[in-house]
From Swiss-Prot:
Stated family: Belongs to the PlsY family.
Function (record text): Catalyzes the transfer of an acyl group from acyl-phosphate (acyl-PO(4)) to glycerol-3-phosphate (G3P) to form lysophosphatidic acid (LPA). This enzyme utilizes acyl-phosphate as fatty acyl donor, but not acyl-CoA or acyl-ACP.
InterPro entries linked: G3P_acylTferase_PlsY
SMART domains in the cross-refs: G3P_acyltransf
Membrane topology: Multi-pass membrane protein
GO biological process per UniProt: phospholipid biosynthetic process
Upper classification of the organism: Bacteria, Pseudomonadati, Thermodesulfobacteriota, Desulfovibrionia, Desulfovibrionales
Subunit structure: Probably interacts with PlsX.
Keywords: Cell inner membrane, Cell membrane, Lipid biosynthesis, Lipid metabolism, Membrane, Phospholipid biosynthesis, Phospholipid metabolism, Transferase, Transmembrane, Transmembrane helix
Catalysed reaction equations from the record: an acyl phosphate + sn-glycerol 3-phosphate = a 1-acyl-sn-glycero-3-phosphate + phosphate
Enzyme Commission code(s) on record: 2.3.1.275
Pathway(s) served: Lipid metabolism; phospholipid metabolism
Name of the coding gene: plsY
Species assigned in the record: Desulfovibrio desulfuricans (strain ATCC 27774 / DSM 6949 / MB)
Record's protein name: Glycerol-3-phosphate acyltransferase
Amino acid sequence: MLEILWIALAYVLGSAPWGLVIARTFCGIDPRESGSRNTGATNVARLCGFGWGVATLLCDVLKGAVPVWLAFRINASPVFVSMVALACVLGHVFSCFMKFRGGKAVATSIGIFLPLAFWQLLASSLLCMLVIWRSGFVSLGSLTLVTALPVALAVSGQWGWLPLSLAVWAVVVWKHRENIVRLRSGTEKSWLKSKNKGAAAGNAAEGDDTQNMNPQDAGRKDG
């Protein structure tokens, strides 16, 4: 009975829309209506700034990590712990606080594996960050992470968590289906391109201001 209640509680905790709470409370923005219309850390970072994106990421990771860590202490059975972990992920994807809509579950998926397969998760996360750094696509990095994790678990002999990692892979890939289409068509948003466009726009604006100045003002600016 305790196990069933804990699975239900894990779903409710996973449903907590921290991205929506943070963006609305501190930025006055509804992330469901702006940017990529997603409550995840990436969209919150785009709309509210890097710091609030990190805060969202941490909250979404913790709402996966804490219930799973406690579940492991209640009953270390891989079946029970996996059900609790999957409940956290499904809560994020189908939030009971947002009419059963939600995010893409990458951060919460990271959270559930923190207490279960730390080193395998670390290796997959480093590969994820490398892909994001090289390509500029957060979505591609996220897909790399959930694809690499089952491989890392299998290679290291952690068979108990392999079914969970495959279920998480299926959920995350399904939630990224539109991103996959955009990646294939070359229309996916890139962090690198966004930064370059912002820098170019700033340089263009500065150039326009200089052209509009009289010679004396331009001289003072150069000095």
